[in-house]
Amino acid sequence: MTVTIKELTNHNYIDHELSATLDSTDAFEGPEKLLEIWFFPHKKSITTEKTLRNIGMDRWIEILKLVKCEVLSMKKTKELDAFLLSESSLFVFDHKLTMKTCGTTTTLFCLEKLFQIVEQELSWAFRTTQGGKYKPFKVFYSRRCFLFPCKQAAIHQNWADEVDYLNKFFDNGKSYSVGRNDKSNHWNLYVTETDRSTPKGKEYIEDDDETFEVLMTELDPECASKFVCGPEASTTALVEPNEDKGHNLGYQMTKNTRLDEIYVNSAQDSDLSFHHDAFAFTPCGYSSNMILAEKYYYTLHVTPEKGWSYASFESNIPVFDISQGKQDNLDVLLHILNVFQPREFSMTFFTKNYQNQSFQKLLSINESLPDYIKLDKIVYDLDDYHLFYMKLQKKI
């Protein structure tokens, strides 16, 4: 699938002033904090008339200020709202949200305000009578170890402090340190037990939810250079009243690196909707949100600075089903690695179905990556999810 130039003109919201003045010169921390909250198991399970998508833009801006990031632009489909942020992305569905923020953002500081807003504006009551904590259907919070932990806000400098803070809000949370337990090579996960008492609704059909994430460090210099803006790409002035160079250059970076061609689909599925929103930062850096079939997304974020280059990819696309068996997440991974050629990378794959085609294919990935050696390979059974984690390094 590929994007077209019309994707530059169909935003539901865009902050041209922020886009024109945003400067990434002092940015340094690529690895993101990833927060995913399922308030209900499905949109058909929601017990009131309003959903998360009824929350206004001004309220999301208020929430994101607590995180220390801003909204660059937003696109809506029938199923989700995709926000491109000054520091990564936010995806809002009717019943759940995924917030991914890099740099020195304070992701966890939005929790109190977020639950206040859903209670006041949506009449969603998740506070328990005992202890005053919240009990949504499911919560995930994860991040790899930071490149510069001492530069984070105090709450995010230490994983144990983050877990303590999360435990003030949620019951039944469990913490995992996945991979080699050193300062630079592990991945952290916090997940709550599924609240099976949450009403599912008469029409509820369980979704075989899956999420694939690839976190890459030490990118090939030539590959990283494709995400650097030249001196002619000054954003001091807008091209036209409804355009800005950051989004224009983001579109060009997407096309030049073929990041819009990660997923293929069969001939009869060629009419699947595909939306794109990307931004190129000055002097360097790239963020993009892609929406497939109205309800699936994949997002990429790149900090190409020499010495701490980093790129991430995350997707909830059920690739085997969407492609009708023509592609799986191993194919997706190989495409991504070809774009960035990292010296090291880790990947995580969550699925509810252990027999998932991509899950089984990724388990035997070694033979498909002859240029890499395995550092870690771990499988977890997490309540109603299976997690596969693997870390690899290029052969010297």
Swiss-Prot record:
Keywords: Autocatalytic cleavage, Decarboxylase, Lyase, Polyamine biosynthesis, Pyruvate, S-adenosyl-L-methionine, Schiff base, Spermidine biosynthesis, Zymogen. Its cofactor is pyruvate. It is an enzyme of class 4 (lyase). One of its GO terms (biological process) is pantothenate biosynthetic process. Binds 1 pyruvoyl group covalently per subunit. Its EC number is 4.1.1.50. Catalyzes the decarboxylation of S-adenosylmethionine, a key step in the biosynthetic pathway for spermidine and spermine. It is essential for normal growth, sporulation, and maintenance of ds-RNA virus. This is S-adenosylmethionine decarboxylase proenzyme. It comes from Saccharomyces cerevisiae (strain ATCC 204508 / S288c). The lineage of its organism: Eukaryota, Fungi, Dikarya, Ascomycota, Saccharomycotina.
